[in-house]
């Protein structure tokens, strides 16, 4: 009888030895819900790459919500990233190469190796074995929901993790494989919906984090979702989804409002796009899904990229399940998730797209050369009219005046304000009314340049500062100084402080004013690299769009 306590104690010790994180002979080992994995060490960080969070969406699982991953018995190697999701072979490099060239730097495009088997994520822990319960930051990469990967080397999370957080980066289905709508898909779905598969992947990854991140030393109740461009849009969209409740506590949105100028496409429009693509791919088949699921994924993506000329097929839609209503209405009605929010933009978001478009499309139209500034700005005004009403033309007079003297800057400023600053300001105000803590920034540190190469703080330029990725091949061409190194450290501290406590401030840094306490206040990461508190984030006419949102009269009716 006396042996019973000993046996019980021994059993508990053996159980803990099998479940608790440990360091094996070749690297750190963690037991997850699907099985055990072995990662590697990167300086002080423990790194785990290529962790499956859902079953491969191949064969009959193409265009279905993500399914649970099959368990494995042996210790799985987690030292190499998983496949990128199928996309244009040039990937992110197609965006960076012409920008680098504009500054006189050579940049070689490296083709992306991708696969339909791509639902993997990566984890960086600041130390091993884990101690305590650390905040978690989950990264959603940008790329218009058509290109990119959470395993891009520019998103290496080790530098951010060193600030005392767990970093997770994920892949999610892209383009036609991630956002395809078709009436037959809706008919076979138990939720009577189609499309939004890439967003369902993101939700599945967040559920994986909820269930497993504790094994890495992370706190499943303190998760910050952060992303850039399309990743930021997706994060803002997920704030409106009932499927995201309790999956994250904070959001950092870099240059991506979840609503903007134009209406959200209807289900009928989205499904019509899908029917057109299906006809292009498999003809008038009586069972188009059977034949579409047999097509090689790369062939399908290539067909859409090269032959389809209709509306964007890589866009989300209000499907009645993931998104019950248009996001703008949910923000305006206060139906969003209760989260802390940080949002911001770069000083000249649109400047790089002129360079990228000209490089991508031979003899691409150059409206700044072929049209006068009046015509160009008027096109913005026509698009903006549903949002700003009769005040539109008066509101943009300053852009027209500026464009007369500096075409590029005038058009860039019009686009920055109308497409990003106004919606982000509305998002900040509506979130503050619902949840409280909101912080807003403007990143204006720019790459030095003259003439046409002076693109300013273009779209995506804050990324190497957030991840301290100046030595990564994507950004090695940047002329980095001690000022940039210091600014990167300050930005990382602000971002991780926010993830820890919902407040980016610390006693040793410039004070970042809270939008919820002083609407319109923000911090500027100024051209000289100094964080400076400011007032007046968006021009006054942006209040018109906010009024329309509140009155349910705006975009996304």
Residue ranges of predicted features:
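A structural signal for well-ordered alpha-helical segments within the folded catalytic domains
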Residues: 46, 116-119, 200-203, 207, ...
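Extracellular structured ligand-interaction cores
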Residues: 34, 116-120, 135, 164-165, ...
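Short, solvent-exposed turn/loop segments enriched in Gly/Ser/Thr/Pro and often Arg
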Residues: 173-176, 226-230, 442-447, 510-516
